[in-house]
Every structure is written in C-alpha cells, then in structure tokens.
Amino acid sequence: MATLKDKLIGHLATSQEPRSYNKITVVGVGAVGMACAISILMKDLADEVALVDVMEDKLKGEMMDLQHGSLFLHTAKIVSGKDYSVSAGSKLVVITAGARQQEGESRLNLVQRNVNIFKFIIPDIVKHSPDCIILVVSNPVDVLTYVAWKLSGLPMHRIIGSGCNLDSARFRYLMGERLGVHSSSCHGWVIGEHGDSSVPVWSGMNVAGVSLKELHPELGTDKDKENWKKLHKDVVDSAYEVIKLKGYTSWAIGLSVADLAETIMKNLCRVHPVSTMVKDFYGIKNDVFLSLPCVLDNHGISNIVKMKLKPDEEQQLQKSATTLWDIQKDLKF
C-alpha cells in the first residue's frame, strides 16, 4: 500500500545516497565548539555540519537543538556522533575539544593534558577525511597546531591554528573605540603567540592608509603619554577578564573561526593572522607554529606575507618562538 510520501512525491532520479560537497566538522561541543558551529551555520558555509564529542547526551541534545532551528538556516544536514565516521568526507575540521582553561591559568599550562587528547582525535580525523584542512582552536593553540601537524602527517599548509585572528580583532576593536572609528576601518596586526607573548605591530597600525606611528612616533613605547601600549595589554588580559566574569570565552572565538572558515570554504584568498610553521622566518630556527599574516584559500595556507618588522618587534617574535619551543621540546606524543 502506498504511503503518504509515495502519494506526494514522484521519483525522478534513481535512488542514491546524497553527497556532501562542503562539509564542516566541529570536534567538541562545549561553549567554544557550539559558538563555532552556530557562527558557521549562520554564514551558510556548508551543506553538512557534523558534531563530534565523547559526551553522548550533550552531543545529541546540541544536535537536536540545532536541527529544530533548521527552518531558519540554509544547511541541509546537521549530524552528530561519538564515532569519527560521522565526520567522513569533511573539507574542514575545526578542533575545539580539550581541557578548559581555568581562571588565572596560562594557556601554556594546558599543554600536556590537551596533547594526550589530541592523540585520540587527530588519527581518526585523518582516517575519515584524508583530504581535509584542520583548523585547531583548542588552547594553547600554537603548540597544539604543531602537535596536530606531527600526529596527522598532513602537509603543513593544511594544518592551521586560529592563532592571532582573534587577538587582532580585539586589538582593532579597542583601537576603534579610542579613535571613534569602526574596527573594520582600523588596521592593526597582532602576531606571534596567541595570548601572553603576542606581538603588536605598532609600525603597521593605520586608518585609511595613514600610519599612526608616523603621526605619533611614541606609539606603543613607554614614553607615550597617551599610553597606547595599554591597548595591547588589554588584548592580552581580555580573555582572562571574560573567563573571570562568565567562566569561559565563546562568542568572539566562534565568530573568529567562522571568519576563517568563510575564507577557506569560499576560496577568498583573504589575509589572516593565523598560526603556521614559522621556521626560517625572522631568524626563527625551530619547528614552531606562530601567527603571521597568511593568505588562506580552499587548499589551506597558500602564502605568508613577509611583514616588515622593526628590530624590537622581530626580537619579540623570536622570544615568543623560544617560549613555545621550550615547552614543545619536552612534549610526549
């Protein structure tokens, strides 16, 4: 007997399993993972979004909650699973899973705990999506991007850390607040380590091509009576402040990740400060991942922009690299 569906639908194509062409997987459905997921969904970047986590009840609940909002989205399929087979065929895999940073805890203190988690995550991702781009968000992001590269066996241009994309966004927001100009028209870069030893490029700050350093030579120095140096301190402190106030950060990093995902999925070739292998750049001799301005496309990182840094900025970058290497060299994975 014909079902209601049979009475309603006349079949034209032969029955076949639908294929996903722009699939994105988010690993970890904590506050950051779900902020990434909803930000990606709101930008209509994928025809399928998969969620993966070890907490099955929460995972199913988050999936159902998003599915129930499907009418308001343009992503055809939202799935979830504890098994990484659900992630198969992903173009982009966003990793947010890991131990959460506690109040007052530096990102680098998280390292070994999260390395142990990555040992289980990375091989399964590569097994099911061997051609994917991996975007690492878990902290400490620079070290864990290095770990993901080592564990995955993928070429380095397909392993990206979210890095200083958010630091730079915070920097530009605070810059705009001071100047009364929207952050999209304020240009400034934060490079190096995501977090405590990040490097603000004072020499590159501009609005409409007008160099702030030329207008105000003391910019970013201890001699600056306007204390613009506090801008970078506020960037570094901001995550700790948000964690102190609400227990974790989520929305800004979620929006930052969706920004990166958009550039990758749409092959936009935009420049972002993301974490990549920096060996042989700016006198750095070790295998460390730090943020530099990178051109992103649908293959991952296609190019690195060679910023002209002042000697003190270059020294800070080298110091940042040394800080990370001192931790990396003792990792067990």
Swiss-Prot record:
This chain belongs to the protein called L-lactate dehydrogenase A chain
Cross-referenced Gene3D superfamilies, in alphabetical order?
A: Lactate dehydrogenase/glycoside hydrolase, family 4, C-terminal, NAD(P)-binding Rossmann-like Domain
**Catalytic-site annotation from UniProt:** H194 (proton acceptor)
| GO terms for MF | L-lactate dehydrogenase activity
Q: Name one GO cellular component term.
A: cytoplasm
Q: Which gene encodes it?
A: ldha
Q: What is its main location?
A: cytoplasm
Give the organism, scientific name: Squalus acanthias
Q: Where in the cell is it found?
A: Cytoplasm
